[in-house]
Amino acid sequence: MNVVWKGFYSIIFLLLIASFPLLIAVENGAITFMPGQALETIQTSFLPEKFMKYELGSEIRSIPHDVVSFGMNTGILLTYSVLLAFIISFLFGYLLNRTSFSKWIRRGAAVLSVVPDFVFVFFAILFAIQLYRATGIRLISLSPTRPTLSIWVPVFTLAITPTIYLIRIIALKYEELLTEDYVRTALAKGLSKRYIDLHHLYRNLKPFLLADLKKVISLTIGSLFVVEFLFNITGLTKFIFVDYQFQKTAVGLLVISLLGLAVYILLRAILYLFEKVMIDG
């Protein structure tokens, strides 16, 4: 029942965000709050002739039909980026505590964590341009009429923020767990590093990972708008922000939320299968 109420409140919250541009108007240089106009527009959007439709120039288009293609691009970008972030952060987090310069890498990750997303996008675009000049290989297109040519440059760029966050969390927790008595006892017994990593470290690290999954996905979705816009990706960012209309904005935000939920479920399933196969299997 709590899940139903959370879902209901989430939908209401998304509708409020989508209606925000309708609540504010500028008249004679002054900002006016107009809840009546917003409520009227929302009510009108549920009329049979306007429900789940939006205007594109002089054409009336179906929102469900168009949101699928936009959502596919965003879904692929979001899923690949989060999975890549988990793979890289697990490898780095595992290796960091076995190197002498782990503290320096953690400090570097802490510094990078305050860098805005658009800076990473800028350097990714700069790298793609230099690569094209040197090799003739074109990875991206900066033309507003052409989509980006390779999904992997945006994927790697979008994965930077969650990767940095996860590296800091995993490395810190690994360092704490290595000082626990049960780990020291296992080492004293001569158990293999692989056994200790899987049965003692991973199992005690997993609750922290599950607790931070939502934050990781939220960080990635926050960066998603910047990456899609600057890389000129035909995704839900364009669907939502180009030519604002309440219905398509509300549906676009809802689809992004559902994609985030799908990625969350996928990651939990992967962690569950990893434990069953690698530890219990």
Model-derived features with residue positions:
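Hydrophobic alpha-helical transmembrane segments of polytopic membrane proteins
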Residues: 154-162, 231-273
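Transmembrane-helix boundary motif in ABC transporter permease subunits
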Residues: 80-110, 122, 224
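Transmembrane alpha-helix signature in integral membrane proteins
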Residues: 61-95, 209-217
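Generic hydrophobic transmembrane alpha-helix motif, especially the helices
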Residues: 109-161
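Transmembrane alpha-helices
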Residues: 11-16, 194-227
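Membrane-cytosol interface at the C-terminal ends of specific transmembrane alpha-helices
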Residues: 144-187
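Non-cytoplasmic
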Residues: 22-30, 211-241, 260
